[in-house]
Amino acid sequence: MKAPHLALFALLAAACLPDAQAADGPVNTRLERVLAETPLIDGHNDLPWMIRERFKGDLGQIDFASDTSHIPPPPDGVALMTDLPRLRAGKVGAQFWSVWVPVDLKGLEAVQTTLEQIDIVKRLVTRYPADLEMAYSASDIRRIHKAHKVASLIGIEGGHQINDSLAVLRQMYDLGARYMTLTHTRNTAWADSATDAPTHHGLTPFGVDVVHEMNRLGMLVDLSHVSPETMKAALAASEAPVIYSHSSARALVDHPRDVPDDVLRLVAQNGGGAGALQCAAVRRPLHRPARPRQGGVGGLGARAP
């Protein structure tokens, strides 16, 4: 294995906006102590794409050091959900910035757009050096957290973004990507998505090669968005812990993007970690009754090693 995996953390979270208010009293005191010592990792944040689409990638149009929620959203969009004050208030120790591109972008266009997304992340971090710093390893996250800054990492949200090329995967790693979600909302040529008709019933031989190359590099295999068959195939193929950057338990919310209990048990055996998705925007009303229970459910077995 080329590099230590970033899954060496006790806490992994993926959130848009928290639904619950901060805890009070002894619980809050304990949380403050834990989060001062252990970096809370938000596994998925789509801010780079919002900056690209709304501001054409021009960071000068937003003041990330102030509350950005007052910026009017586009007619068919949502308000910005992230800024430095809210990262600090949420005690975020490390943030995976998603460099997602739409699944209808193919080939070299998908690769180029991914590179442009990576550029947005790095320029954002450079613009706020007192608060943000790029991280490429577990030790980087610990060091940056101790310096009271938010460690910034890059996650690729879809295997379509490497254009079926292990060489592109390697170069994305060299540019800072530390996880890749194997699919987004549609199948790739080598892996099935949770929200598309099954084609491969898991991974193709090339898909297994992708997992093995990610293992070799020290790049996290992210199983959010993939089908249960793909989850199981990737868990069988992976020689390192996997993650779910933004998925929840299907037993609580019966959504195709969430993780069945039998797979969660395999994740525990793998030593991997599952984040908790708190973004109400991706929940249809049909699925929302379980939301009040999510914050209080523990002991599911999956953990970060």
Predicted regions: what they are:
Residues 1-7:
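Bacterial N-terminal signal peptides that target proteins for export
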Residues 7-15:
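Bacterial N-terminal signal peptides
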Residues 21-200, 254-305:
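N-terminal hydrophobic targeting/anchoring segments and the immediately downstream early-domain regions
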Residues 40-47, 226, 244-247:
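Histidine-centered catalytic micro-motifs
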Residues 165-169, 230-240:
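Distinct, well-ordered alpha-helical segments
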Residues 199-217, 234-244:
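Alpha-helix-loop-beta-strand connector modules within alpha/beta enzyme cores
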Residues 210-223, 227-233, 261-272:
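Substrate-binding cleft of carbohydrate-active enzyme catalytic domains
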Residues 228-229, 249-251, 280-283:
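Short, catalytically relevant binding-site loops at active-site mouths
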